[in-house]
A protein has these predicted regions:
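Active-site groove signature of glycoside hydrolases
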Residues: 126-145
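Short, well-ordered coil/turn segments that N-cap beta-strands
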Residues: 25-29, 57-59, 87-93, 130-134, ...
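Short, acidic/polar
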Residues: 41-53, 112-127, 176-180
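Conserved beta-strand positions
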Residues: 31, 63, 97, 135-138, ...
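N-terminal binding-site loop/beta-alpha segment at the start of enzyme catalytic domains
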Residues: 1-93
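N-terminal small/glycine-rich loop or linker at the start of catalytic domains
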Residues: 20-38, 96-109, 132, 137
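Beta/alpha (TIM)-barrel catalytic core signal, keyed to glycine-rich beta->alpha loops juxtaposed to Asp/Glu
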Residues: 2-13, 145-332
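Acidic-and-aromatic substrate-binding clefts and catalytic sites of carbohydrate-active enzymes
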Residues: 38-43, 66-74, 142-146, 173-174, ...
Length: 332
């Protein structure tokens, strides 16, 4: 059956923010395919989530070469959806991918060399059935490769027509400042920085990253807005057997201390008092920062996506509520 997107996908369902000083607008909520879209996940479920997102005004889909599992399979899933459903709407989509983390064996399978970045993007384009991506990121800073080499590769990728814009991900403030300067001199200014930012991890506010983005006219997109599920009702009563902490990986059991549980429970009560879920309040908190261009969410189901998108219909946090959140973080 042929897919036809919702006719009112650009109604008041979604608001869009300017990305730095560029001509690009990003949806306040974007969809990331880090988890739940790999080869181990049912294809029909992945397709349903992506099409629901587009039907509701999400135009930005964020990937990376090694998203899955297995590596590359999230791009393959997305490429299949592009080919079968979304190809007629390619010009309405803003697609990003990244390279820099472990992807293939040998000395050229990761980090920031020119060889790795070009090879990885060529592979990504093939997996996604695309001629170009809208944003290509250096996924992490490589301290062993000259920054000039990495930035020149990004610039040349744009000049080769393989990407329209470039971005950097998880770069420390001082290195990001140098990267912005090189890219500007190359006449391919940095469009966006992607960084971890949420109520429990406020470092971009304090380490200069957010203010640096604003000063340099660079957008900022926040990943891990729910702190890998900690900022939800998932861990209020312990560690569920099917949770990310129970499965291992990035989140460790020692992350969930008694203090952390107390903070999460207090935040959850504040969210209840506001008439929303903790996840919705966490997204709302991020959108309250004018330097945040977009919040990058994941989705394990259409229902979860629907609930998180409903945040856009919620009133913003008041100054008093923001202070209550800070009090919770510092008083427990």
């Amino acid at each position: 059956m042929q897919y036809y997107p919702s006719e009112d996908r650009y109604s008041d369902k979604m608001k869009y923010r300017r990305c730095g000083k560029s001509g690009i607008l990003l949806p306040e909520i974007s969809l990331g395919l880090w988890h739940n879209f790999g080869g181990v996940d049912p294809y029909e479920g992945s397709k349903a989530k992506i099409l629901y997102a587009f039907d509701n005004g999400i135009t930005h889909f964020d990937l990376a070469n090694n998203y899955g599992p297995p590596y590359g399979s999230a791009e393959e899933t997305f490429g299949r959806i592009i080919k079968n459903e979304l190809y007629p709407y390619r010009d309405e989509l803003l697609i990003s991918t990244k390279a820099g983390h472990d992807m293939w064996k040998g000395p050229y399978g990761e980090w920031g060399s020119r060889k790795h970045l070009f090879a990885s993007l060529n592979q990504s384009l093939q997996r996604m059935n695309l001629e170009y991506v809208d944003i290509f990121y250096s996924h992490r800073y490589d301290p062993d490769t000259p920054l000039e080499e990495t930035m020149q590769a990004l610039s040349d990728i744009v000049k080769a027509g393989k990407a329209l814009y470039v971005g950097i991900s998880k770069y420390p403030y001082d290195v990001a400042e140098k990267a912005y300067k090189i890219l500007k001199e190359n006449k391919t200014p940095c469009l966006i920085l992607q960084g971890r930012f949420n109520i429990l991890e406020e470092s971009p506010l304090n380490n200069g990253v957010l203010s640096g983005c604003e000063k340099n006219g660079v957008g900022f997109i926040a990943f891990s807005p729910l702190a890998q599920g900690l900022l939800s009702d998932r861990y209020l009563n312990g560690i569920p057997n099917d949770s990310r902490i129970a499965r291992g990986g990035y989140l460790k059991k020692e992350t969930l201390t008694e203090k952390q549980i107390s903070i999460i429970k207090s935040l959850n009560q504040l969210a209840i008092d506001r008439g929303e879920s903790l996840a919705q309040m966490a997204i709302n908190w991020l959108l309250g920062h004018h330097s945040v261009t977009s919040v990058l969410i994941g989705a394990s189901s259409v229902e979860q996506l629907k609930i998180n998108l409903a945040t856009l219909n919620r009133p913003p946090l008041s100054d008093q509520e923001k202070q209550l959140i800070q009090n919770i973080l510092t008083s427990i």
